[in-house]
């Protein structure tokens, strides 16, 4: 009974109940004039015999005493303030971290960002990004908002996502980067934006193809097919030229880039399918050479 009464007195003096799941600690010796928790004061209290319920006070093996020693080791007078933490913050840090994943609201925002990028909704994309929605979050197929925007050719959304930290080299479930998808469409500005944002032209998909390989495949299709109209073919060739120009610019191959500029000028002057085919053949040879140089560099 006396022990129980003593325990009750301890609880009343500490102002806290053991039912809170926290140790009762006398506030006066443990807080400074500013109400800050001090490990130094806590260690002194332990050394002075102020024990914790259910623990041996002042024991040499006390985890709290060991923590106190580590905290004070090699401390200099100017570091005194570093040894003080607000008591409330210390209690919060001691609690288990309960956030195991995004909340339902956050999941909805992530999905909405991808859907908005896919729907070319620039205003909603910007709003969600400014609210802190993660631009790198992917769906169950590994596709991010940047994958959707690159595939759709929306250069404005692509730039917005890159400005807010989207990874231009993030792969989807098939290993495609946004540049792989952009290389399969007719949107040269997106390719330029991705390359300037750090996209790698030598990134491999799961089939071992780079965006340059996809460009070469498109050129082969253009050389074999005759069903597309002249303007569509010209647009395809222009896109591939633009991608190669940015690639060579990043590598510092200015002489080769000038050759591409000449091809682009010739393309603009074409008026017949035969002239476009001639430029396409030259570009195919140039692309093959670029791929060979790329493979040599990897070795």
UniProtKB/Swiss-Prot annotation:
Motif (Nuclear localization signal (NLS)): 98-116
SMART domains named among the record's database cross-references: ANK
Main localization of the protein described in the UniProt heading: nucleus
Motif Nuclear export signal (NES): chain residues: 282-292
UniProt region (Disordered), positions on chain: 1-32
Gene Ontology biological process terms, A to Z: nucleocytoplasmic transport; positive regulation of erythrocyte differentiation; regulation of intracellular signal transduction
Location(s), subcellular: Nucleus; Cytoplasm; Midbody
Entry keyword set: Acetylation, ANK repeat, Cytoplasm, Nucleus, Phosphoprotein, Repeat
Chain residue ranges for the region called LYN-binding: 140-240
SUPFAM superfamilies associated with the record: Ankyrin repeat (SSF48403)
A GO MF label: protein kinase regulator activity
Top-level taxon of the source organism: Eukaryota
Modification Phosphoserine occurs at: 57, 62
Spans through the membrane: none
ANK repeats mapped onto the chain: 108-137, 141-170, 174-203, 207-239
Subunit structure of this chain's protein: Interacts (via ankyrin repeat region) with LYN (via SH3-domain) in an activation-independent status of LYN. Forms a multiprotein complex with LYN and HCLS1. Interacts with TSN2, VAV1, DBNL and LASP1.
Protein name stated in the entry: Ankyrin repeat domain-containing protein 54
Source organism (scientific name): Bos taurus
Gene name, Swiss-Prot/TrEMBL: ANKRD54
């Amino acid at each position: 009974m006396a022990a129980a009464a003593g325990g009750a007195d301890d609880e009343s003096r500490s102002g806290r109940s053991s039912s809170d799941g926290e140790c009762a600690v006398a506030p006066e010796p443990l807080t400074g004039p500013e109400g800050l928790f001090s490990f130094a004061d806590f260690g002194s209290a332990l050394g002075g015999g102020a024990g914790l319920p259910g623990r041996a006070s002042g024991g040499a093996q006390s985890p709290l005493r060991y923590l106190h020693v580590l905290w004070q080791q090699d401390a200099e007078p100017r570091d005194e303030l570093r040894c003080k933490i607000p008591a409330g913050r210390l209690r919060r840090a001691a609690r288990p971290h309960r956030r195991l994943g995004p909340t339902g609201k956050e999941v909805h925002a992530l999905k909405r960002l991808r859907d908005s990028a896919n729907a070319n909704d620039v205003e909603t994309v910007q709003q969600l990004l400014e609210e802190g929605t993660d631009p790198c979050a992917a769906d169950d197929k590994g596709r991010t908002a940047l994958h959707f925007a690159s595939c759709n050719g929306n250069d404005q959304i692509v730039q917005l996502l890159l400005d807010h930290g989207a990874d231009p080299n993030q792969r989807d479930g098939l290993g495609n980067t946004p540049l792989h998808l952009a290389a399969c469409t007719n949107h040269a500005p997106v390719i330029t934006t991705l390359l300037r944002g750090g996209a790698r032209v030598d990134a491999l998909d799961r089939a071992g193809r780079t965006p340059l390989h996809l460009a070469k495949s498109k050129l082969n299709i253009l050389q074999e097919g005759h069903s597309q109209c002249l303007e569509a073919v010209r647009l395809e060739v222009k896109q591939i030229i633009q991608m190669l120009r940015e690639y060579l610019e990043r590598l510092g191959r200015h002489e080769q880039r000038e050759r591409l500029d000449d091809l682009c000028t010739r393309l603009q002057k074409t008026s017949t399918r035969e002239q476009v085919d001639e430029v396409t053949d030259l570009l195919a040879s140039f692309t093959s050479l670029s791929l060979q140089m790329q493979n040599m560099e990897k070795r």
